[in-house]
UniProtKB/Swiss-Prot annotation:
It comes from the Archaea. The active site is at residues 94, 96, 274. The lineage of its organism: Archaea, Methanobacteriati, Methanobacteriota, Methanomada group, Methanobacteria. InterPro entries: DNA_primase_S, DNA_primase_ssu_euk/arc, DNA_primase_ssu_PriS. Its EC number is 2.7.7.-. GO terms for cellular component: DNA-directed RNA polymerase complex; primosome complex. This is DNA primase small subunit PriS.
Length: 324
Protein backbone atom coordinates (compact mmCIF):
# COMPACT_ATOMS: atom_id res chain seq x y z
CA UNK A 1 0.00 0.00 0.00
CA UNK A 2 1.01 3.66 -0.58
CA UNK A 3 3.06 2.73 -3.67
CA UNK A 4 2.71 4.53 -7.01
CA UNK A 5 -0.08 3.48 -9.37
CA UNK A 6 0.92 2.32 -12.85
CA UNK A 7 -0.75 3.60 -16.02
CA UNK A 8 -2.54 0.26 -16.31
CA UNK A 9 -3.89 0.63 -12.76
CA UNK A 10 -4.99 4.21 -13.40
CA UNK A 11 -6.89 3.10 -16.48
CA UNK A 12 -8.49 0.30 -14.51
CA UNK A 13 -9.57 2.71 -11.79
CA UNK A 14 -11.17 5.28 -14.09
CA UNK A 15 -12.80 2.73 -16.39
CA UNK A 16 -14.04 0.22 -13.83
CA UNK A 17 -14.34 1.95 -10.47
CA UNK A 18 -14.69 5.73 -10.83
CA UNK A 19 -18.24 7.07 -10.85
CA UNK A 20 -19.84 10.52 -10.96
CA UNK A 21 -21.85 9.35 -7.94
CA UNK A 22 -18.65 9.57 -5.91
CA UNK A 23 -18.31 13.29 -6.61
CA UNK A 24 -19.72 15.48 -3.80
CA UNK A 25 -22.87 17.48 -4.50
CA UNK A 26 -21.07 20.74 -3.68
CA UNK A 27 -18.75 20.01 -6.62
CA UNK A 28 -21.35 18.72 -9.08
CA UNK A 29 -23.84 21.55 -8.80
CA UNK A 30 -21.42 24.25 -10.01
CA UNK A 31 -19.14 22.15 -12.20
CA UNK A 32 -19.14 24.52 -15.16
CA UNK A 33 -17.97 27.47 -13.04
CA UNK A 34 -14.75 25.80 -11.95
CA UNK A 35 -11.39 25.38 -13.59
CA UNK A 36 -9.97 21.86 -13.94
CA UNK A 37 -6.30 20.93 -14.10
CA UNK A 38 -4.57 17.64 -14.82
CA UNK A 39 -1.19 16.03 -14.28
CA UNK A 40 -0.60 13.37 -16.93
CA UNK A 41 2.95 12.29 -16.09
CA UNK A 42 3.53 12.89 -12.39
CA UNK A 43 5.35 16.20 -12.92
CA UNK A 44 2.57 18.55 -11.85
CA UNK A 45 -0.72 19.91 -13.21
CA UNK A 46 0.50 21.35 -16.52
CA UNK A 47 -2.79 20.75 -18.32
CA UNK A 48 -4.79 23.69 -16.95
CA UNK A 49 -7.82 25.85 -17.78
CA UNK A 50 -10.05 22.90 -18.63
CA UNK A 51 -13.82 23.33 -18.35
CA UNK A 52 -16.54 20.67 -18.27
CA UNK A 53 -20.18 21.55 -18.80
CA UNK A 54 -21.38 18.40 -17.09
CA UNK A 55 -20.33 15.18 -15.38
CA UNK A 56 -20.62 13.05 -18.54
CA UNK A 57 -17.97 15.02 -20.44
CA UNK A 58 -15.69 14.80 -17.39
CA UNK A 59 -16.31 11.06 -17.22
CA UNK A 60 -15.29 10.59 -20.86
CA UNK A 61 -12.13 12.64 -20.33
CA UNK A 62 -11.05 10.70 -17.25
CA UNK A 63 -11.68 7.33 -18.87
CA UNK A 64 -9.74 8.30 -21.97
CA UNK A 65 -6.81 10.08 -20.32
CA UNK A 66 -6.53 8.21 -16.98
CA UNK A 67 -4.54 11.16 -15.55
CA UNK A 68 -1.88 10.82 -12.88
CA UNK A 69 -3.82 13.45 -10.90
CA UNK A 70 -6.99 15.49 -11.38
CA UNK A 71 -7.61 18.89 -9.81
CA UNK A 72 -10.48 21.35 -9.52
CA UNK A 73 -10.43 25.01 -8.54
CA UNK A 74 -11.71 26.23 -5.20
CA UNK A 75 -12.72 29.39 -7.07
CA UNK A 76 -15.90 30.02 -9.04
CA UNK A 77 -15.59 32.02 -12.26
CA UNK A 78 -17.96 33.28 -14.90
CA UNK A 79 -15.17 32.43 -17.35
CA UNK A 80 -13.18 29.57 -15.79
CA UNK A 81 -11.39 28.75 -19.06
CA UNK A 82 -9.45 31.98 -18.66
CA UNK A 83 -9.81 32.28 -14.88
CA UNK A 84 -11.64 35.56 -15.43
CA UNK A 85 -14.51 37.24 -13.60
CA UNK A 86 -13.79 35.63 -10.21
CA UNK A 87 -16.92 35.33 -8.07
CA UNK A 88 -15.91 33.60 -4.85
CA UNK A 89 -13.75 30.77 -3.52
CA UNK A 90 -13.97 28.01 -0.96
CA UNK A 91 -11.96 28.51 2.23
CA UNK A 92 -9.54 25.63 2.68
CA UNK A 93 -7.56 24.02 5.49
CA UNK A 94 -5.02 21.55 4.08
CA UNK A 95 -3.42 19.07 6.50
CA UNK A 96 -0.98 16.60 4.94
CA UNK A 97 0.01 13.67 7.17
CA UNK A 98 3.60 13.64 5.90
CA UNK A 99 4.06 17.32 6.80
CA UNK A 100 2.80 17.24 10.39
CA UNK A 101 5.80 18.61 12.34
CA UNK A 102 5.22 16.46 15.45
CA UNK A 103 4.46 12.89 14.42
CA UNK A 104 4.53 10.02 16.87
CA UNK A 105 5.02 7.49 14.05
CA UNK A 106 8.32 8.93 12.72
CA UNK A 107 7.70 7.27 9.34
CA UNK A 108 9.29 8.59 6.12
CA UNK A 109 6.03 9.05 4.19
CA UNK A 110 2.51 8.28 5.35
CA UNK A 111 1.22 5.41 7.45
CA UNK A 112 -1.85 4.40 9.41
CA UNK A 113 -0.61 6.21 12.53
CA UNK A 114 0.06 9.66 11.01
CA UNK A 115 -3.12 9.46 8.92
CA UNK A 116 -4.98 8.89 12.18
CA UNK A 117 -3.18 11.86 13.72
CA UNK A 118 -4.10 14.03 10.71
CA UNK A 119 -7.76 13.10 11.20
CA UNK A 120 -7.56 14.05 14.89
CA UNK A 121 -6.13 17.43 13.90
CA UNK A 122 -8.80 18.21 11.28
CA UNK A 123 -11.57 17.10 13.64
CA UNK A 124 -10.27 19.61 16.18
CA UNK A 125 -10.13 22.34 13.53
CA UNK A 126 -13.69 21.62 12.39
CA UNK A 127 -14.94 21.74 15.98
CA UNK A 128 -13.40 25.21 16.37
CA UNK A 129 -14.78 26.42 13.04
CA UNK A 130 -18.26 25.31 14.07
CA UNK A 131 -18.31 26.10 17.79
CA UNK A 132 -16.29 29.32 17.91
CA UNK A 133 -16.97 30.84 14.49
CA UNK A 134 -20.44 29.47 13.74
CA UNK A 135 -19.49 28.09 10.32
CA UNK A 136 -21.58 25.10 9.26
CA UNK A 137 -21.26 24.54 5.50
CA UNK A 138 -18.15 22.46 5.98
CA UNK A 139 -17.05 19.42 3.98
CA UNK A 140 -14.15 17.11 4.77
CA UNK A 141 -12.23 15.41 1.95
CA UNK A 142 -9.58 12.71 2.32
CA UNK A 143 -6.87 13.75 -0.15
CA UNK A 144 -4.96 10.47 -0.32
CA UNK A 145 -2.35 11.32 2.28
CA UNK A 146 -4.14 13.90 4.39
CA UNK A 147 -7.30 15.97 4.55
CA UNK A 148 -8.86 19.07 3.02
CA UNK A 149 -11.43 21.00 5.04
CA UNK A 150 -13.56 22.79 2.43
CA UNK A 151 -15.69 25.63 3.80
CA UNK A 152 -18.56 27.00 1.69
CA UNK A 153 -20.17 29.47 4.10
CA UNK A 154 -20.88 32.58 2.04
CA UNK A 155 -19.14 35.00 4.42
CA UNK A 156 -15.88 33.07 3.96
CA UNK A 157 -16.36 32.33 0.26
CA UNK A 158 -16.48 36.04 -0.55
CA UNK A 159 -13.70 37.06 1.85
CA UNK A 160 -10.22 38.17 0.84
CA UNK A 161 -6.83 36.74 1.75
CA UNK A 162 -6.35 39.02 4.78
CA UNK A 163 -9.46 37.79 6.61
CA UNK A 164 -8.65 34.19 5.67
CA UNK A 165 -5.21 34.61 7.19
CA UNK A 166 -6.61 35.98 10.46
CA UNK A 167 -9.16 33.16 10.75
CA UNK A 168 -6.41 30.63 10.03
CA UNK A 169 -4.24 31.98 12.86
CA UNK A 170 -7.17 31.85 15.29
CA UNK A 171 -8.32 28.34 14.41
CA UNK A 172 -4.78 26.95 14.24
CA UNK A 173 -3.67 28.48 17.55
CA UNK A 174 -0.82 30.26 15.80
CA UNK A 175 -0.23 32.98 18.39
CA UNK A 176 0.47 32.77 22.12
CA UNK A 177 -2.47 34.36 24.00
CA UNK A 178 -1.65 37.53 25.86
CA UNK A 179 -1.40 37.10 29.63
CA UNK A 180 -1.38 40.69 30.90
CA UNK A 181 -4.74 42.44 31.17
CA UNK A 182 -5.15 46.10 32.14
CA UNK A 183 -8.28 47.09 34.09
CA UNK A 184 -8.84 50.87 34.41
CA UNK A 185 -11.83 50.31 36.72
CA UNK A 186 -9.70 48.75 39.46
CA UNK A 187 -7.06 51.35 40.32
CA UNK A 188 -5.49 51.01 36.87
CA UNK A 189 -4.07 47.65 37.89
CA UNK A 190 -2.67 45.05 35.55
CA UNK A 191 -3.60 41.40 36.02
CA UNK A 192 -1.82 38.30 34.78
CA UNK A 193 -3.76 35.26 33.62
CA UNK A 194 -1.96 32.40 31.93
CA UNK A 195 -3.66 30.83 28.90
CA UNK A 196 -4.32 27.60 30.80
CA UNK A 197 -6.31 29.43 33.50
CA UNK A 198 -8.92 30.69 31.01
CA UNK A 199 -11.05 27.69 29.91
CA UNK A 200 -12.91 29.47 27.09
CA UNK A 201 -12.31 31.16 23.73
CA UNK A 202 -8.92 31.45 22.11
CA UNK A 203 -7.01 30.65 25.31
CA UNK A 204 -8.69 27.24 25.41
CA UNK A 205 -7.97 26.63 21.72
CA UNK A 206 -4.28 27.36 22.25
CA UNK A 207 -4.06 25.35 25.48
CA UNK A 208 -5.69 22.29 23.92
CA UNK A 209 -3.31 22.37 20.95
CA UNK A 210 -0.29 22.94 23.17
CA UNK A 211 -1.23 19.92 25.28
CA UNK A 212 -1.81 17.79 22.17
CA UNK A 213 1.61 18.68 20.75
CA UNK A 214 3.44 18.05 24.02
CA UNK A 215 1.79 14.66 24.47
CA UNK A 216 2.78 13.59 20.94
CA UNK A 217 6.46 14.53 21.21
CA UNK A 218 8.85 11.64 20.66
CA UNK A 219 11.96 13.53 21.74
CA UNK A 220 14.04 13.74 18.58
CA UNK A 221 12.13 16.59 16.94
CA UNK A 222 14.16 19.64 15.95
CA UNK A 223 12.11 22.69 16.90
CA UNK A 224 13.29 26.30 17.11
CA UNK A 225 13.95 27.48 20.69
CA UNK A 226 13.66 23.95 22.10
CA UNK A 227 17.13 22.59 22.81
CA UNK A 228 17.79 18.94 23.76
CA UNK A 229 17.76 19.70 27.51
CA UNK A 230 14.41 21.47 27.30
CA UNK A 231 12.99 18.70 25.14
CA UNK A 232 14.10 16.12 27.71
CA UNK A 233 12.46 18.07 30.54
CA UNK A 234 9.22 18.60 28.60
CA UNK A 235 8.88 14.85 28.19
CA UNK A 236 9.94 14.25 31.81
CA UNK A 237 7.31 16.57 33.28
CA UNK A 238 4.46 16.26 30.79
CA UNK A 239 2.72 13.75 33.07
CA UNK A 240 1.41 16.82 34.94
CA UNK A 241 -0.79 17.56 31.93
CA UNK A 242 -2.65 14.26 32.25
CA UNK A 243 -4.65 16.02 34.97
CA UNK A 244 -4.24 19.52 33.49
CA UNK A 245 -1.82 20.56 36.23
CA UNK A 246 -0.31 23.32 34.11
CA UNK A 247 1.00 25.24 37.10
CA UNK A 248 3.19 22.31 38.18
CA UNK A 249 4.35 21.77 34.60
CA UNK A 250 5.34 25.43 34.18
CA UNK A 251 7.08 25.39 37.58
CA UNK A 252 9.21 22.37 36.68
CA UNK A 253 10.03 23.66 33.19
CA UNK A 254 10.76 27.19 34.44
CA UNK A 255 9.02 30.45 33.38
CA UNK A 256 11.60 31.52 30.80
CA UNK A 257 11.83 28.11 29.15
CA UNK A 258 8.05 27.79 29.29
CA UNK A 259 7.81 30.98 27.24
CA UNK A 260 10.19 29.47 24.68
CA UNK A 261 8.02 26.36 24.59
CA UNK A 262 4.75 28.20 23.97
CA UNK A 263 6.27 30.35 21.22
CA UNK A 264 7.75 27.28 19.53
CA UNK A 265 4.43 25.45 19.66
CA UNK A 266 2.57 28.42 18.20
CA UNK A 267 4.83 28.08 15.15
CA UNK A 268 4.23 24.33 15.08
CA UNK A 269 0.48 24.92 15.12
CA UNK A 270 0.67 27.17 12.07
CA UNK A 271 3.01 24.85 10.16
CA UNK A 272 0.61 21.93 10.65
CA UNK A 273 -1.67 23.59 8.08
CA UNK A 274 -0.54 24.68 4.60
CA UNK A 275 -1.15 28.41 5.02
CA UNK A 276 -0.54 29.15 1.33
CA UNK A 277 -3.56 27.04 0.42
CA UNK A 278 -5.79 28.78 2.98
CA UNK A 279 -5.17 32.30 1.68
CA UNK A 280 -5.05 31.46 -2.05
CA UNK A 281 -8.22 32.59 -3.84
CA UNK A 282 -7.44 30.68 -7.06
CA UNK A 283 -5.95 27.42 -5.78
CA UNK A 284 -6.69 24.07 -7.41
CA UNK A 285 -7.12 21.00 -5.19
CA UNK A 286 -7.39 17.30 -5.85
CA UNK A 287 -10.76 16.40 -7.30
CA UNK A 288 -12.78 14.35 -4.79
CA UNK A 289 -13.36 10.90 -6.37
CA UNK A 290 -10.05 11.04 -8.28
CA UNK A 291 -7.01 8.82 -7.75
CA UNK A 292 -3.94 9.98 -5.81
CA UNK A 293 -1.51 8.03 -7.97
CA UNK A 294 1.58 8.68 -5.82
CA UNK A 295 0.11 6.59 -3.00
CA UNK A 296 -2.61 4.61 -4.86
CA UNK A 297 -5.44 5.95 -2.71
CA UNK A 298 -8.82 7.47 -3.54
CA UNK A 299 -9.41 11.15 -2.88
CA UNK A 300 -12.92 11.11 -1.43
CA UNK A 301 -15.45 13.00 0.64
CA UNK A 302 -15.64 11.87 4.26
CA UNK A 303 -19.25 11.24 5.24
CA UNK A 304 -18.59 10.46 8.90
CA UNK A 305 -15.45 12.04 10.31
CA UNK A 306 -15.75 10.17 13.62
CA UNK A 307 -15.58 6.70 12.07
CA UNK A 308 -13.75 7.23 8.75
CA UNK A 309 -10.89 4.81 8.10
CA UNK A 310 -8.99 5.49 4.85
CA UNK A 311 -7.40 2.04 4.89
CA UNK A 312 -10.87 0.52 4.72
CA UNK A 313 -12.77 3.07 2.62
CA UNK A 314 -10.25 4.72 0.27
CA UNK A 315 -8.33 1.75 -1.13
CA UNK A 316 -8.90 1.12 -4.87
CA UNK A 317 -9.71 -2.39 -6.06
CA UNK A 318 -6.44 -2.68 -7.97
CA UNK A 319 -4.50 -2.35 -4.69
CA UNK A 320 -6.45 -5.26 -3.24
CA UNK A 321 -5.64 -7.24 -6.37
CA UNK A 322 -1.94 -6.57 -5.84
CA UNK A 323 -2.23 -8.57 -2.63
CA UNK A 324 -0.67 -5.81 -0.52
Amino acid sequence: MFSKATLKERRQYYREEWSTKDMPDFILKDLKKREFGFDHNGKGPNDRYKVFRGSESLKKFLRYKAPFAAYISVAFYNNPRRREDWQKAEYIFDVDAKDIPIRSCQCDGVCEVCLGQALEIVNSLIDTLQDDLGLNNIHLVYSGRGYHIRILDEEMMTSGSELRSEVLKYVAGAEVPKSNFFNPDISNKSFNFEHFSIPVGYSKIFTDKLKYNIQHLVGNEELDEINPKLMKDIIKYRHHLDNDNWGYFKRDIGPRRYKNLTEAMARVNLSTIDAKVSIDLKRILRLPSSLHSKVSMKCMEVKNRETFDPLQEAVPKFVEERGE
